[in-house]
């Protein structure tokens, strides 16, 4: 009786761990993909790859005075009043999950002479 119960429990635990690994890979994909507005993004740690934000938001960095110094961080935002942005400001058109679709919202425009 115990052998059958133990085997069932062991199989259940294995099934759960497989599902857990899938969840971890999905979380990693989400972190490397587009981030919801209001979510934390990486603007200071890796300026060469500013993470993409959904709905044409930008990874905006802020610096807020506190009692003992400043609170700094970066969040996906649509507001322009944050202090500075990532060097490579990027957004994902249409809320895409694919970071390769992210592009600079301020491309250099050619000036046409008259």
Swiss-Prot record:
Residues 16-32 form a propeptide. Residues 1-15 form the signal peptide. Transmembrane segments: none annotated. It is found in: Secreted. Keywords: Calcium channel impairing toxin, Disulfide bond, Ion channel impairing toxin, Knottin, Neurotoxin, Presynaptic neurotoxin, Secreted, Signal, Toxin, Voltage-gated calcium channel impairing toxin. The keyword Disulfide bond applies. GO terms for molecular function: calcium channel regulator activity; toxin activity. Expressed by the venom gland. Residues 95-114 are annotated as: Disordered. PROSITE patterns: OMEGA_AGA_II_III. The keyword Disulfide bond applies. One of its GO terms (cellular component) is host cell presynaptic membrane. Belongs to the neurotoxin 04 (omega-agtx) family. 03 (type II/III omega-agtx) subfamily. The presence of a 'disulfide through disulfide knot' structurally defines this protein as a knottin. This is U10-agatoxin-Ao1a. It comes from Agelena orientalis (Funnel-web spider).
């Amino acid at each position: 009786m115990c052998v059958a119960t133990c085997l069932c429990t062991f199989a259940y635990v294995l099934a759960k761990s497989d599902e857990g690994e899938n969840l971890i890979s999905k979380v990693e994909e989400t972190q490397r993909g587009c981030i919801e507005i209001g979510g934390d993004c990486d603007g200071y740690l890796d300026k060469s790859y500013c993470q993409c934000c959904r709905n044409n938001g930008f990874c905006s960095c802020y610096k807020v005075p506190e009692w003992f110094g400043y609170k700094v961080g970066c969040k996906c935002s649509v507001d322009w009043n944050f202090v500075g942005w990532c060097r490579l400001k990027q957004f994902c058109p249409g809320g895409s999950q694919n970071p390769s679709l992210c592009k600079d919202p301020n491309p250099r425009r050619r000036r046409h002479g008259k």
